[in-house]
């Protein structure tokens, strides 16, 4: 069974140049969606928007395909994970630090991402997927009984004594 999950990562430690580049790319993309006039948007973002969002006049963020995003683990004080976001005019893109995540990106496959700006801060919504085996038998089962005398009674399979709540 395939499981999908969206991880919300804040971009931290942005320099003024990186923030200006991301703001320019974000604003130019939104302007291109509204008017159709290209003020300098990365071409792959335009291709995705033409294909996916034919009727959208404004979007929540900039969609990023999985082949355009690169998330790697680095041993730095700023952040454990770094992402490379493609921007028009910068060869190779902009390397940004992702806020400390209790998530292991190496164990999952990265699908697509969305670059979002909220209150002047940038967030990267990364969608990941993984194939997991469905369990057919569980080791611990908890039964909850809602009653009139006791609000709730729970019994775990491995424990023989019930717990009374109420």
Annotate each PLM feature.
Residues 1-166:
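Nucleic-acid substrate recognition interfaces
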């Amino acid at each position: 069974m395939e499981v999908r999950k969206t991880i919300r990562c804040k971009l931290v430690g942005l320099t003024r140049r990186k923030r200006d580049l991301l703001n320019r790319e974000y604003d130019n993309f939104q302007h291109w969606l509204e008017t159709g006039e290209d003020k300098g948007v990365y071409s792959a973002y335009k291709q995705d928007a033409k294909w996916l969002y034919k009727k959208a006049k404004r979007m929540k963020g900039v969609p990023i395909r999985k082949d355009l995003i690169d998330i790697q683990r680095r041993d730095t004080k700023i952040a454990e994970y770094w992402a490379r976001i493609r921007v028009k005019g910068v060869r190779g893109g902009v390397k940004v630090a992702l806020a400390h995540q209790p998530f292991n990106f190496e164990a999952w496959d990265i699908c697509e991402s969305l670059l979002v700006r909220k209150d002047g801060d940038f967030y990267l919504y990364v969608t990941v997927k993984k194939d997991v085996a469905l369990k057919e038998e569980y080791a611990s089962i908890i039964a909850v009984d809602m009653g009139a005398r006791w609000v709730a009674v729970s019994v775990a399979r491995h424990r023989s004594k019930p717990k009374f709540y109420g």
